[in-house]
């Protein structure tokens, strides 16, 4: 299941009792999700609309980064989805936390929302990378052509993709 990162504290909108029902939990920022409270609504939804247009402050990037790092450290998710889509982060810091905690960073099947340099930062840090179709229709299930074109264009070794021709073992389940 894909949950929403919906607070600056790194909370996801999946109840603790429900987490055990899912084999894999993906988490990411989604523009249409509801925030947990008015402060997070302002910081997560209103501010990014302006920042996408006029630029992100260092403070905003760090706040967003901290939210992702807290989500990773919480142990409540296996994969961070479409990093930097709708909310700019410091990719190196997020990648380091992902590596340290065994959380995969997704290259998304609709769009890779990071620059080539940011994707290579993830590779250089050694964070686990997963490709995902992000299918919103049955015809797109398993279509990883978008992320794999980035992998091929950047010369990334396919063997570092945790779900390339093999089933990954996710950190949250491995810890059980």
Please name every model-derived segment.
Residues 104, 128, 157:
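Residue-level detector of anion-binding/catalytic polar loops
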Residues 2-4, 123, 146-148:
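Active-site catalytic microenvironments in core metabolic enzymes, especially phosphate/sugar-handling
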Residues 127-142:
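Short acidic/histidine-rich active-site segments
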Residues 102-111:
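His/Asp/Glu-enriched short active-site or ligand-binding loop at hydrolase and phosphoryl-transfer sites
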Residues 144-155:
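C-terminal helical cap(s) of enzyme catalytic domains, especially alpha/beta-barrels
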Residues 1-100, 152, 160, 172-176:
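Extended substrate/RNA-proximal surfaces in nucleic-acid metabolism proteins
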């Amino acid at each position: 299941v894909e949950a929403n990162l919906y607070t600056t504290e790194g909370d996801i909108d999946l109840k603790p009792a429900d987490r055990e029902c899912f084999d894999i939990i993906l988490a990411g920022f989604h523009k249409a999700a509801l925030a947990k409270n008015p402060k997070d609504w302002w910081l997560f939804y209103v501010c990014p609309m302006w920042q996408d247009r006029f630029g992100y402050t260092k403070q905003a990037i760090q706040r967003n980064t901290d939210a992702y790092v807290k989500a990773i450290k919480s142990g409540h998710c296996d994969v961070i989805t479409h990093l930097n889509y709708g909310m700019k982060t410091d990719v190196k810091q997020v990648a380091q936390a992902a590596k340290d905690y065994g959380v995969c960073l997704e290259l998304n099947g609709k769009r890779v929302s990071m620059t080539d340099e940011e994707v290579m930062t993830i590779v250089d840090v050694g964070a686990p990378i997963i490709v995902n179709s992000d299918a919103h229709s049955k015809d797109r299930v398993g279509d990883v052509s978008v992320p794999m074109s980035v992998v091929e264009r950047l010369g990334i070794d396919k063997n570092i993709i945790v779900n390339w021709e093999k089933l990954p073992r996710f950190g949250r389940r491995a810890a059980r």
